[in-house]
Amino acid sequence: MLHPRARTMLLLSLPAVAIGIASSLILIVVMKIASVLQTLLWQRLPGTLGIAQDSPFWIIAILTLTGIAVGLVIRFSQGHAGPDPACEPLIGAPVPPSALPGLIVALILGLAGGVSLGPEHPIMTVNIALAVAIGARLLPRVNRMEWTILASAGTIGALFGTPVAAALIFSQTLNGSSEVPLWDRLFAPLMAAAAGALTTGLFFHPHFSLPIAHYGQMEMTDILSGAIVAAIAIAAGMVAVWCLPRLHAMMHQIKNPVLMLGVGGFILGILGVIAGPVSLFKGLDEMQQMVANQAFSTSDYFLLAVIKLAALVVAAASGFRGGRIFPAVFVGVALGLMLHEHVPAVPAAITVSCAILGIVLVVTRDGWLSLFMAAAVVPNTTLLPLLCIVMLPAWLLLAGKPIMMVNRPKQQPPHDNV
């Protein structure tokens, strides 16, 4: 016979597995549709028209039209494509299900059109809303927070292809009760995360790891080098943190979302022309291209880091529906490669991983997620002790500093009140 604690944990096991699978399938379908549309917009259509896909005209035109299209969705769809991600944390309160179709369409358009945001925030919003709405009907005795946690865990597992990230994140958020052991509280979320990760793995494997030279033995000087790299990344990230609310307020002086996002898309197009196509889109595939291209110099990496960070701020400030983690990882990789090119004595594994740790820490203010992303992109067990040590001064630097999020306006724009 099972102990009552075990029976309690098993109660949510089946819903947890179902939510994890559903979270992954939603992500897979959205990404597949976005990929097909991206191929149409950036390969087939310019080829048919006899235009180079990397021509300045095409980049500016597609991103401007993407902004206008997303603006139309936000203006006229029911629920206005959900809340503004710039004003929301990664895991937020459930939104009305009526807002989800518009949010999904806005996300697909942004991903396919080359906007420098990832899918994580909208997908999280969709999965939480569906889990809460359906779960409340099927099992009304389970509170909304439980459904939110399961959907969040399933989505994190699906996004990163492993339940490890969910375990790290929820180990700090669920450890609030001394009466219930932590692993009792983690059981159902980890079931959801594992189901999400395994389902994603059946269709595709997220490629986070980069072909960077293996790091051998840790030296004391490497700790100092890593701390300096993380501090540089944090400084760059804090510039973006300072710019985001100010640019957000400036862009939202334009009350019409179609015009506002059209202007935002035009600016993104100009930034894309400056840095080239590798600076577009969410950044995961593009950082693989960046590492594979041996022709990039220190100045090229610097330009890519600055432009991608600027594009991230512009996209978020303009109201595009997307997340900030994936493009931030791209910025970290570009910064790390730049610093390695500038000081070759410092291994690329250190510069890249510590730059990712610093910039993701600025964006998420989550130490576990920052460590996970750094270790996922540069998978080397020798680096783990170094990253844990470097995290300490990085966390001190950010203590009490503002986060990369805009305070919600006291009065929403007219198109958000409809």
From Swiss-Prot:
Gene that this sequence comes from: yfeO
Membrane topology: Multi-pass membrane protein
Record protein name field: Putative ion-transport protein YfeO
MF terms in GO: chloride transmembrane transporter activity; monoatomic ion channel activity
Keyword hit for Transmembrane: yes
Locations listed in the record: Cell membrane
Cellular component, GO, one term: plasma membrane
Organism: Escherichia fergusonii (strain ATCC 35469 / DSM 13698 / CCUG 18766 / IAM 14443 / JCM 21226 / LMG 7866 / NBRC 102419 / NCTC 12128 / CDC 0568-73)
Family: Belongs to the chloride channel (TC 2.A.49) family.
Lineage, highest ranks first: Bacteria, Pseudomonadati, Pseudomonadota, Gammaproteobacteria, Enterobacterales
NCBIfam families: PRK03655.1
Cleavable signal peptide: none
Chain segments annotated as transmembrane: 10-30, 54-74, 99-119, 120-140, 149-169, 186-206, 223-243, 258-278, 300-320, 322-342, 343-363, 386-406
Keywords (A to Z) from UniProt: Cell membrane, Ion channel, Ion transport, Membrane, Transmembrane, Transmembrane helix, Transport
